[in-house]
Amino acid sequence: MRIIANKNKKNKKKFPWKIILDNKRCIPVPSQYNFKSNFIRRHGCSLVGFYMALRFRGIKKNMQQCLSYARRRLKCGAKYPLTEICRGINMICSGKPAVYHKSMSNDRIEAHLKKGHMILFEEGNPIHTVVLLRDNKTGRVWRFSDGRKNVTTVEKENKKKCTNEKYKGIVIVK
């Protein structure tokens, strides 16, 4: 896995980073605050996770297509909960690649990351969805959120987990 800065002047603002996986698949990292749609700017973190998970599985939809699909087929409160995002990924992708868990131990999350899976994680206070991926060459765990990338640990992220009954959870995308 490599993470490179986007050099394209047309879409650099909306997608500042690109993740290139070992199988040469490219996942742009969206910055939700630079989209026209008011819903994406305010509550788009779960849609960013939805978009990145579909790209991880090899399905190319843009953010607007993800939003229109979610509006037509998924249930929404203030934002889309991870249960609905998981259901949406499984509707689009063949083989049911996404699995939802209410909570998970650090060891189990670490094991999934070592296998090369993508993790969508709901943080609390404020409620926010982030994407976790592991670089197998360096062993670092990367956290993607709001068009930014940070190195983190599973323990740090698990301490920040959401406790709200409706929104809490973890989605593993294989």
Pin down the residues of each PLM region:
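Conserved active-site-adjacent core of cysteine acyl-enzyme catalytic domains
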Residues: L54-K174
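Active-site-adjacent structural segments surrounding the nucleophilic cysteine of cysteine proteases
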Residues: M1-K75
